[in-house]
């Protein structure tokens, strides 16, 4: 039997009918803050408000619902960093199927607990591997040994068709408001979302520029399509944007993206953190890192989108509150507002007061101070964190620190040392 490897608008239309009474029609909202910031009209497609707080339910339910009754009776499996797993769990409960869900051990606890909540007694969760790709290998082995049905998170035409229903829904909403999009920004992990969306947009909104957004530490689609012209596996990835940190995209999604995506943007993980905080404080939107990717890319395109109409897909809102400290730290590092140094500190009374008076600026704040006293030496080692009010103050701060201790170590430039602090 020939395996289907292409997706058509007809496939998406059929998926739309299957999902009509299953998924929530999420809002398409004009965002006044972003529109004012970038001097254009910015709409947000709020998939963070979906039943499982991400678009993944669309693809998971569609892929599972097309299985035969015999296949369904054998049970289903999947591998996921979180959101696809929640979609599969929700579907397993809805259709009363047995599911074994494999998740990386690095998956935020919030996502693991949500999978168990949505699936209840229909779902068994297995935590294995440090990355999605390691987790995937375990899931495929288990699926083969137990003759179950693997529900691919992105490299499956039914999954892609399900994700594509988001585009159909979005264009119908835009049409009712007499809106035409000049640009669409959407996150890329394995490529299922961008493949489904771009397939529908190229037929029904061909003048819309499709921009795929990846974290700079896991830009597997860009490296495959643009740099190598073939699917490649990244040897190392930054797992921070966990919903979009995939070392290897799908063969099917690669071909669709290569044909449909107009451009790719790589966004620094620190910029994503700044966007998460900005969206929460300015718009009261709780976005996970992958969910904030599309909005993060607007800064790269601010000259292109001026006066245009733009839509960003907020793909997910499953953020673990326990990660907020790290998110704030990464944002401050990216914005050049917080800086860490290792200093040799004089071991005499009044040394700290001298440091505060001579080194700190009037608006600088000490956020970390760890002192290791050495009884046999004249100096002790200090790790100090300083937060600025303005990143332009950094040059003068460094000059004062160098005068205080010419042998100081600036930790921000040393990824290994910095990783020990957050």
Curated annotation (Swiss-Prot):
Homotetramer. Its EC number is 4.3.1.19. Pathway: Amino-acid biosynthesis; L-isoleucine biosynthesis; 2-oxobutanoate from L-threonine: step 1/1. Catalyzes the anaerobic formation of alpha-ketobutyrate and ammonia from threonine in a two-step reaction. The first step involved a dehydration of threonine and a production of enamine intermediates (aminocrotonate), which tautomerizes to its imine form (iminobutyrate). Both intermediates are unstable and short-lived. The second step is the nonenzymatic hydrolysis of the enamine/imine intermediates to form 2-ketobutyrate and free ammonia. In the low water environment of the cell, the second step is accelerated by RidA. It holds the Pfam family Thr_dehydrat_C. PANTHER family: THREONINE DEHYDRATASE, MITOCHONDRIAL, THREONINE DEHYDRATASE, MITOCHONDRIAL-RELATED. Keywords: Amino-acid biosynthesis, Branched-chain amino acid biosynthesis, Isoleucine biosynthesis, Lyase, Pyridoxal phosphate. The keyword Mitochondrion does not apply. It catalyses: L-threonine = 2-oxobutanoate + NH4(+). Residues 339-413 form the ACT-like domain. Belongs to the serine/threonine dehydratase family. The modification N6-(pyridoxal phosphate)lysine is found at residue 56. Its cofactor is pyridoxal 5'-phosphate. It is an enzyme of class 4 (lyase). InterPro entries: ACT-like_dom_sf, IlvA, Ser/Thr_Dehydratase, Ser/Thr_deHydtase_PyrdxlP-BS, TD_ACT-like, TD_ACT-like_sf, TrpB-like_PALP, TrpB-like_PALP_sf. It comes from the Bacteria. One of its GO terms (biological process) is threonine metabolic process. It comes from Staphylococcus aureus (strain MRSA252). GO terms for molecular function: L-serine ammonia-lyase activity; pyridoxal phosphate binding; threonine deaminase activity. This is L-threonine dehydratase biosynthetic IlvA. Pyridoxal 5'-phosphate binds at residues 83, 189-193, 315.
